[in-house]
UniProtKB/Swiss-Prot annotation:
NCBIfam families xref list: lepA, small_GTP
Phylogenetic classification of the source organism: Bacteria, Bacillati, Bacillota, Bacilli, Bacillales
Primary subcellular site in the record, as a coarse category: membrane
Keywords recorded for this protein, A-Z: Cell membrane, GTP-binding, Hydrolase, Membrane, Nucleotide-binding, Protein biosynthesis
Binding residue positions for GTP: D23, H24, G25, K26, S27, T28, N140, K141, I142, D143
Protein name: Elongation factor 4
Gene: lepA
Class of the enzyme per the UniProt entry, highest EC level: hydrolase
Organism, as annotated: Macrococcus caseolyticus (strain JCSC5402)
Protein task: Required for accurate and efficient protein synthesis under certain stress conditions. May act as a fidelity factor of the translation reaction, by catalyzing a one-codon backward translocation of tRNAs on improperly translocated ribosomes. Back-translocation proceeds from a post-translocation (POST) complex to a pre-translocation (PRE) complex, thus giving elongation factor G a second chance to translocate the tRNAs correctly. Binds to ribosomes in a GTP-dependent manner.
InterPro entries recorded: EF-4, EFG_II, EFG_III/V, EFG_V-like, EFTu-like_2, G_TR_CS, LepA_C_sf, LepA_CTD
Length: 607
């Protein structure tokens, strides 16, 4: 291709993504767009086509972003090249959204005609506005009996401030309004800016590992062109490689001669090491490099940490490999080795939130076949010591000696909860119970309220979302962002089994709730830990002080079964012997702890 052809082609490229709250019909709309642009043969079409992971299809959510190239012949007779970059909608995967938006010029904002704007929609809209994207509002599911498109149109204008008078009324399921959406993309989304003759600049927005071809990087070309045989250089690491193949996804990978400005495709360069192709890095030519890298992504810091251990201790190295491969295209995953007396060798892994944690654990069990035990998640606490130093604690068992701690700080989040006004009382009660501080309350219209609370992250992390959904019959939607640290009265609680501390069961709790929580946990463990041949005391302690205790009764073997009547001293001798045996067993016996026991520490509030 010469330069003139490249520039002409560039004018016909439209890069866009679809943003929406969970369940507002994003993946279905993506399916319809693929169908209407005839980019997928009818027989290959299946629901949620872009959600390639089994987990995504089962849970009906999008986890990873995906990019596809489509050709669309518009009403003006021109054929346009669309790049659709699919995004997840769940709060834990916000970083996936910010990654895909950085590769676009426009975004389709999908809002459910029955439910209206939800917390996640707003959060993603702000991300899109930060990236200066052109927003196209679409009101989806208008064929539902409960649909109120006019109310939602007004809501988009009032809450987001977008002109929604031309908003497309659509139903992705019934294939209504899809043509109008495609035409609006052509009209409203600007073509990519960039110079095909400038030095190459390409943003890596995703990467995956293939056993045969090495690392496959998904890239968006900002300036310049790249083709097979080029010598390229990663700007963050300075490593150089030779390009083996460039291509586009039509959802299948298809090699092409070159990728030029505005193209979204993939590149392989026999990169063997997972760490050499970092998401957010800039690729440039080794011989004629760009002067400065593109602005990457802001690093998402993990908020929740938990210990992950293989049940079969021989699989420790396999687990390390699994985590490295997942980290390749999940930049926010962090891990470091740790050991526990109760569980052996494993890793301390950092996640963005609970859903992220669940999904990663499930992916390790499925994709790599490693069975795991996970400890209770905890957040990062900061301790100001009496000698003026600061200690950061991400694992409750590493909490310093309470005598040496002056103050403890814990992370707080600003939680915005959108809810119908019938449930305001229930939401406020839940937030108070979770130690939240009320901030503001705005009425969006006559039925929906946006409530803002500051809540400790440790309270949000466990089961806040589940409780919020159940106390509002599923109507509330919820989004949170970290706002910083605040001082709290926190103590570390240890659980002792048979007089020994189990490090993996320790957790950090607010002093006012310590007694109740200790009591609940001890009772719960009593039912979960199998009975031994000797009596096992279960205790909850803060420092040296035991605050709750119960006993797991022993399984009694009837040693008198073979005595038929007869001499009392004979029976007494057998009972004494049994008692001595049990005492000895108790001093050396160890207690097996089932996986449920670790989870019991989390799910406290169900009582």
């Amino acid at each position: 291709m010469n330069n003139e052809q490249r520039l002409k082609r560039q004018e016909r490229i439209r890069n866009f993504s679809i943003i929406a709250h969970i369940d507002h019909g994003k993946s279905t709309l993506a399916d319809r767009i693929l169908e209407n642009t005839k980019s997928v043969a009818t027989r290959e079409m299946k629901a949620q086509l872009l959600d390639s992971m089994d987990l995504e299809r089962e849970r009906g959510i999008t986890i990873k972003l995906n990019a596809v190239q489509l050709n669309y012949t518009a009403k003006d007779g021109e054929t346009y090249i669309f790049h659709l970059i699919d995004t997840p909608g769940h709060v834990d995967f916000t970083y996936e959204v910010s990654r895909s938006l950085a590769a676009c010029e426009g975004a389709i904002l999908v809002v459910d005609a029955a439910q209206g704007i939800e917390a996640q929609t707003l959060a993603n809209v702000y991300l899109a506005l930060d990236n200066e994207l052109e927003l196209i509002p679409v009101i989806n599911k208008i064929d539902l009996p409960a649909a109120e498109p006019e109310r939602v149109r007004q809501e988009i204008e009032d809450v987001i401030g977008l002109d929604a008078s031309d908003a497309v009324l659509a139903s992705a399921k019934a294939n209504i309004g899809i043509e109008d959406i495609l035409e609006q993309i052509v009209e409203l989304v600007p073509p990519p800016m960039g110079d095909p003759e400038a030095p190459l600049k390409a943003l890596i927005f995703d990467s995956a590992f293939d056993a045969y071809r090495g690392v496959i990087s998904s890239i968006r070309i900002i300036d310049g062109t790249v083709k097979a045989g080029d010598k390229i250089k990663m700007m963050a690491t300075g490593k150089e490689f030779e390009v083996v193949e460039v291509g586009i996804n039509t959802p299948k990978q298809m090699p092409v001669a070159e990728l030029t400005v505005g193209d979204v495709g993939y590149l392989t360069a026999s990169i063997k090491n997972v760490g050499d192709s970092r998401v957010g890095d800039t690729i440039t030519h080794a011989s004629n490099p760009a002067s400065e890298p593109l602005q990457g992504y802001k690093k998402m810091n993990p908020m929740v940490f938990c210990g992950v251990y293989p049940i079969d201790t021989g699989k420790y190295n396999d687990l390390r490999e699994a985590l490295e491969k997942l980290q390749l295209n999940d930049a926010s995953l962090e891990f470091e080795p740790e050991t526990s007396q109760a569980l052996g060798f494993g890793f301390r892994v950092g996640f963005l939130g609970l859903l992220h944690m669940e999904i990663i654990q499930e992916r390790i069990e499925r994709e790599f076949g490693i069975e795991l035990i996970a400890t209770a998640p905890s957040v990062i606490y900061k301790c100001e010591m009496t000698d003026g130093s600061e200690v950061v604690v991400d694992n409750p068992s590493k909490m310093p000696d309470p005598q040496k701690i002056d103050k403890i700080y814990e992370p707080y989040v600003k939680a915005s909860i959108m809810v119908p006004n019938d449930y305001v009382g229930a939401v406020m009660e839940l937030c108070q119970k979770k130690r939240g501080n009320f901030q503001t309350m705005d009425y969006l219209d006559d039925i929906r309220v946006n409530i803002i609370y500051e809540v400790p992250l440790s309270e949000v992390v466990f089961d806040f979302f589940d409780q919020l959904k159940s106390s509002t019959k599923g109507y509330a939607s919820f989004d949170y962002e970290l706002i910083g640290y605040q001082e709290s009265k926190l103590v570390k609680m240890d659980i002792l089994l048979n007089g020994e501390t189990v490090d993996a069961l320790s957790f950090i709790v607010h002093r006012d709730f310590a007694y109740d929580r200790g009591k609940v946990i001890v009772e719960k463990l009593k039912t979960l830990i199998p009975r031994q041949q000797f009596e096992v005391p279960v205790q909850a302690a803060i420092g040296q002080k035991i605050i709750a205790r119960t006993n797991i009764k022993s399984i009694g073997k009837n040693v008198l079964a073979k005595c038929y009547g007869g001499d009392i001293s004979r029976k007494r001798k057998l009972l004494e012997k049994q008692k001595a045996g049990k005492a000895k067993m108790k001093s050396v016996g160890s207690v097996e702890i089932p996986q449920d026991a670790f989870l019991a520490v989390l799910k406290m509030d169900e009582e």
